[in-house]
């Protein structure tokens, strides 16, 4: 039996110092070649910037860096005070309260259906086109949960729930007295309002607020400020005309621990996205694809007493789940 001679190869002979690993270039790679993964920093950064510029929680709240999906806090509920001490006298022990709290991040997802032609876009073209839609979906969902306790809020806390706990509610119209009384609800607990959350439909009501003695208006439409404090407008049908929230927003804390991840699907039926006739969108049948993007966000409220709300006199403020 003849033995087969095996060719001995010197693999180093085929190696070349000039051969470099291929670098991912978003301008050359088509979306149908890269249907999932972690979004590149050059696209994540502008999306997060747009989210932070438009989210009312992120505009007004206090950012806390996070390295994981959970962060533990220790802070003063009642800060220690100082005492006058005479010569030879014993220094009194200050009464203070430490509070331990945990802020946990939850995954926030958005599904955006688009035509199949989008798969022929380059990675850069695709995410440049989708960037504003991704950002808007993220900040609207986060604000509705953290401010109004809407949309299956996973945090277990929100400004609406804090107001419900403390019953810091003023019922009435947009008048100077009611605005002062609203701010006073915080001052009673040695807190100070530093902003208002309103909506665009309230601007005509705000412009009508007049000091009865000086006849001056306390709303400045040029700077969008009320009683010297900034007013931000929340775009949500769940905040009604005639409702106004104020608070010490230093007590509202948020975090963003992870980058944005994405996946493109071509076959799913989207139960949460409807056609004009009310039927679910079927990607395969309708020759579409869907982008699913996810990010983690965290929220914590350090003091429930830091928020109050003005509502119309006939507005119900109890026994309505998820509403205040």
UniProtKB/Swiss-Prot annotation:
After translation, how is this protein modified? The N-terminus is cleaved by ribosomal processing protease Prp.
Q: Which residues form the propeptide?
A: 1-14
Main location per the UniProt record: virion
What Gene Ontology cellular component terms go with this record? viral capsid
Q: Which UniProt keywords apply?
A: Capsid protein, Late protein, Virion
Source domain of life is Viruses
Q: Where in the cell is it found?
A: Virion
Protein family per UniProt: Belongs to the HK97 phage major capsid protein family.
- What binding partners and quaternary form does the record give? Forms homopentamers and homohexamers in the mature capsid forming a 63 nm icosahedral head with T=7 architecture. The procapsid is made up of hexamers and pentamers of this subunit. There are seven subunits in the asymmetric unit in the T=7 procapsid. Found in the procapsid with the scaffold protein in a 2:1 capsid protein:scaffold protein molecular ratio.
Function, as annotated, reads: Assembles to form an icosahedral capsid, as well as procapsid, with T=7 icosahedral symmetry.
Protein name, as recorded: Major capsid protein
- The protein's organism comes out as Staphylococcus phage 80alpha
